[in-house]
Amino acid sequence: MRTTEHVVIVGGGTAGWLTAARLGAMADRRFDITLVESPSVPTVGVGEGTWPSMKATLQAIGLSERLLIAECDASLKQGTLFHGWRTGAADDTYLHPFSLPPEYASKNLAEYWRRDGLRYPFHEVVTPQALIATTHKAPKTADTPDYAFALNYGYHVDAVKFAALLRQHSISKFGVRHVEGHVAGVSSDAAGFLTSVELEGGNSLSGDFFVDCSGQKALLIGDHFKVPFESARQVLPNNRAVVAHVPYNEPNDEIHSCTQSSAQDCGWIWDIGLQSRRGIGYVHNADLVSEADATQTLRNYAEQSVGAKVAGD
């Protein structure tokens, strides 16, 4: 078995830099890590939600939670609140909380809920997190240690700021080498194993292990290894998204402690609350609705909370 001495990561953003940090923490500088990314490919930053498992990942790479919250415009996410997915009525809501109900693994809680006559929404009966989250309370207090909690949570983060923080952390803590450049091709040995990536301008980056974080471009897994894209269109028909940043009306407006997910005629709208703004987007099927109509749907949604003038801007 070959010894890994140099890992090359192709692609940056949250995926690339989180990979770099995770490998850096595992390697303890036993091997070198280089990340190459194109300076002309921006990180998409409309607001991003994570699962609670992100806490363990950030702990593993030694990143301060308080620094994350301060630097990434972050808020704490306690689940996802779904609006209008069944009947579309005003009271048609369902919360997927991140704290598991007590005894969920040993008892059928739905049966107890049914016996009680279905008087209250299921999420209100099985976990206290529903009340905490929907009244905009936090799952922990300000003096709770990093990553400890009373109720489980993930994060809402600004993806651009999150990638920048991970980059700084990977370079300073783990010595990751950062290269800006466009990958023009790859080289491989007789067995087909990658040996280097070639950059525009003639430079190359040699390595023993390569990680493809180039997203849909699939510069290694697609262009070199010819692994085809596997569509899930038959079960996930939505294929486009229009996105926007939405300001708060007032600096002290409440920040939603859950991702909001609102059903629409041809898809759904996400609404993620950061400290300084919201990130919203309409995921839809472009075969069923035009981009202009999808954009108008998103604008109408924004108008409900910030008014027509702000939404129009």
Where are these regions (language model features)?
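N-terminal Rossmann-like FAD-binding beta1-loop-alpha1 element of flavoenzymes
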Residues: 5-31
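Dinucleotide-binding Rossmann-like beta1-alpha1 core, especially the glycine-rich loop
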Residues: 46-134
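Flavin (primarily FAD) binding-site architecture
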Residues: 212-227
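Glycine-rich FAD pyrophosphate-binding loop
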Residues: 24-46
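Conserved FAD/dinucleotide-binding core of flavoprotein oxidoreductases
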Residues: 263-313
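Helix-loop-beta segment of a Rossmann-like dinucleotide-binding subdomain
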Residues: 131-161, 196, 204-205, 274-285
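Helical element adjacent to the flavin cofactor pocket in flavoenzyme catalytic cores
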Residues: 149, 153-184, 200-201, 207
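A conserved short coil-to-beta-strand element within the FAD-binding core of flavoproteins
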Residues: 179-195
